[in-house]
Amino acid sequence: MNEEQFVNIDLDDDNVCSVCKLGTEKETLSFCHICFELNIEGVPKSDLLHTRSLRGHRDCFEKFHLIANQDCPRTKLSRSPYAEVKSILSKKINWIIQYAQNKDIDSDTESSKTSQHPLFNLRHQTDRKLLPQFDSPVPRYSAKWIDGNSGSISNCSQSLLEQSEPTDFRLGMLQETGATFCCSSVLWSNRSQAQKTEKAESDSLTSPHRRHPHYSREELNMMTTGELKQLNEKLLKQIQDVFEELTQQVQEKDSLASELNVRHIAIEQLLKNCSKLPCLQMGRAGMKSNVPI
């Protein structure tokens, strides 16, 4: 019967480098001198890469620390460009949704923390008016009163335009009940007449029918030619002021209607494209991004 042959295994690994796992002479192995210097500088032992019990080559420990200190963050490796594009697209669509819902973007704390990307530098401008589109009809009104004779301004009208007193010839002047016209060269109302005008406006709002000053045929016949001319110019000036005021109101109404139409179109397009973007979810508060970080 053959004798059993046993293989002797040396469990003494004092001559094996803990980094490269190669056997060498025991005299050439030592502990990590870099961790030893860091411990002397105040770094706790729990943050060190090697303990005092590990033995290895000096070059192996230096290469180990060199590889460990390389600038290779995990976030840069695990984050894909597609995820970054989805994040930017989600934030941009959320901004469009907030703009369409007429929300205040400047008060949003989340938007103030975002990066200075060109997509996020846009802000809602309340004073901006939308330009007419290519298929929009041309307005049938003018912003200025068109004079039929296209002649020079008369002396009386020029004196009226050069007055420094505040002008109150608006819609309220046509509603004033006891308005009278003076025959002097200055036809603008003074401060006391302005207060009467405001009082007449408040009274006219409560009355069922608004009234404006009128003259009978006898009163007009008793006036001189100069008085009639001044009265005519004053009435023309009132008509021009009312016309420009109504024109401004119509323009503001058209601008608001155009802006509302653009918002409705934006919301409709976003709802149609919602199914094509799996990174977005529809909720009661609007579109919410669902991008994994």
From Swiss-Prot:
Protein name: Protein EURL
Tissue specificity field: Expressed in undifferentiated retina and lens.
Keyword terms, alphabetized: Coiled coil, Differentiation, Neurogenesis
Recorded family membership: Belongs to the EURL family.
Role: Plays a role in cortical progenitor cell proliferation and differentiation. May promote dendritic spine development of post-migratory cortical projection neurons by modulating the beta-catenin signaling pathway.
Single Gene Ontology BP annotation: positive regulation of dendritic spine development
Superkingdom, natural source: Eukaryota
Coiled-coil blocks: 226-260
